[in-house]
Amino acid sequence: MMDERRRMVQDLMERGYIKSEAVRRAMERVPREEFVPEDEMHRAYMDMPLPIGEGQTISAPHMVAMIAEILDLEPGMKVLEIGTGCGYNAAVIAEIIGPEGHLYTVERIGILYERARKKLRSLGYDNITVIHGDGSQGFADEAPYSRIYVTAAAPYIPDPLMKQLEIGGKLLIPVGSDKFYQELVLIERTSADDYRSRNLGGVAFVPLIGKHGWKFH
């Protein structure tokens, strides 16, 4: 499937989603087929989200590339991901921040947490720690973070995530009261008490569920 992966990366470069060498290299290294269910493997390198069970999806490759480019990652950064899902996004980010960096990723659904933890370990990602918990509250134990990104949509920006950013750090999150359309917002912490935000356009993500997210029963 390496040829298919290279073709996908080339396509994303031509369409302007992959701009940097770091993101190109990361997406070329990570085997997306390892993160999708067996009956979806034939579609692993199509640019589309795919079901991974429990009502969740693996993001389309163009969205993964776009997030990685927006975050403007550097080797050695400490990053927090909310919504591990299958672990594919985490693997791409981990490739960019390298062994000197570390990614903490929080997943609320037990089955997905276990699957992702085992898969990432089997692929040798020692710079990723998978946590089972409510991602809307972040992960204060290892704060502050250089970058925080959320792979599910929140009705508002969770205060704990803002507080867990280091000064100069960035938070990327889909926000909106409509469960089928949100705005992708990039927030930068400019001082202890000040933040600035930028709206990057419309997206559609699965809902963030938890204390500071949607409350479904």
Curated annotation (Swiss-Prot):
The keyword Transferase appears for this protein: yes
- Keywords, A to Z? Cytoplasm, Methyltransferase, S-adenosyl-L-methionine, Transferase
Where do the TM regions start and end? none
Q: What class of enzyme is it?
A: transferase
- Report the EC number(s), separated by commas if there are several: 2.1.1.77
Catalyzed chemical reaction(s): [protein]-L-isoaspartate + S-adenosyl-L-methionine = [protein]-L-isoaspartate alpha-methyl ester + S-adenosyl-L-homocysteine
Q: Where in the cell is it found?
A: Cytoplasm
One GO-annotated biological process of the protein:
protein modification process
- Principal localization reads cytoplasm
Citing just one GO molecular function, the answer is: protein-L-isoaspartate (D-aspartate) O-methyltransferase activity
The family database entries (InterPro entries) matched by this protein are listed as: PCMT (IPR000682), SAM-dependent_MTases_sf (IPR029063)
Summarizing the function annotation, the protein's role is: Catalyzes the methyl esterification of L-isoaspartyl residues in peptides and proteins that result from spontaneous decomposition of normal L-aspartyl and L-asparaginyl residues. It plays a role in the repair and/or degradation of damaged proteins.
What name does the UniProt record give this protein?
Protein-L-isoaspartate O-methyltransferase
